[in-house]
Amino acid sequence: MPRTQKNDNFVDKSFTVMADIILKILPTNKKAKEAFVYYRDGMSAQAEGEYAEALEYYEEALTLEEDTNDRGYILYNMGLIYASNGDHNKALELYHQAIELNPRLPQALNNIAVIYHYQGEKEKEAGDNEAGEALFDQAADYWIRAIRMAPNNYIEAQNWLKTTGRSQIDVFF
């Protein structure tokens, strides 16, 4: 059964109806519309915690979607799933692919930084301060890029950059 037929709450039903109306009136080709349906169903499954199902929908959307920006969002959402399941290496791979296709994704840059920071913490806990600091430096680089794109976001990252001496004066202005 298509995911769109499973939506049983008012908000999901409303979103589905509106998305279907927009799909019908948008001047786009059938393949792009079909890709969006899979993407929408992937988001719905992801929101319900049905990660395996969401990944299937996203994979199908990737095979159909030709727009690089949209492909970037699909890869980003797939990265979210892998990160939430603890597969940080796969999440990093997908976030990097997303940024290659759509460089205006500060949320992907932030998530890369979060993973590098987490890995840095783990290295330091294991007693490898040098590896931990190297990962912190990588996290800082990605947070700086994210903050430059969205200066009103990532306040905790901005504070971390300042308190660790990794901020650059022009980052915040």
Swiss-Prot record:
Keywords: Membrane, Photosynthesis, Repeat, Thylakoid, TPR repeat
Gene3D superfamilies the UniProt entry points to: Tetratricopeptide repeat domain
UniProt gene name: ycf3
Gene Ontology cellular component list: plasma membrane-derived thylakoid membrane
Family named by the database record: Belongs to the Ycf3 family.
UniProt cross-references to Pfam families, sorted A to Z: TPR_1 (PF00515)
Annotated InterPro entries: PSI_Ycf3_assembly, TPR-like_helical_dom_sf, TPR_rpt, Ycf3/AcsC/BcsC/TPR_MFPF
Protein name: Photosystem I assembly protein Ycf3
HAMAP family: Ycf3
Repeat region (TPR), residues: 35-68, 72-105, 120-153
Function: Essential for the assembly of the photosystem I (PSI) complex. May act as a chaperone-like factor to guide the assembly of the PSI subunits.
Gene Ontology biological process terms in this record: photosynthesis
Compartments where found: Cellular thylakoid membrane
Organism (species): Nostoc punctiforme (strain ATCC 29133 / PCC 73102)
Top-rank lineage group of the source organism: Bacteria
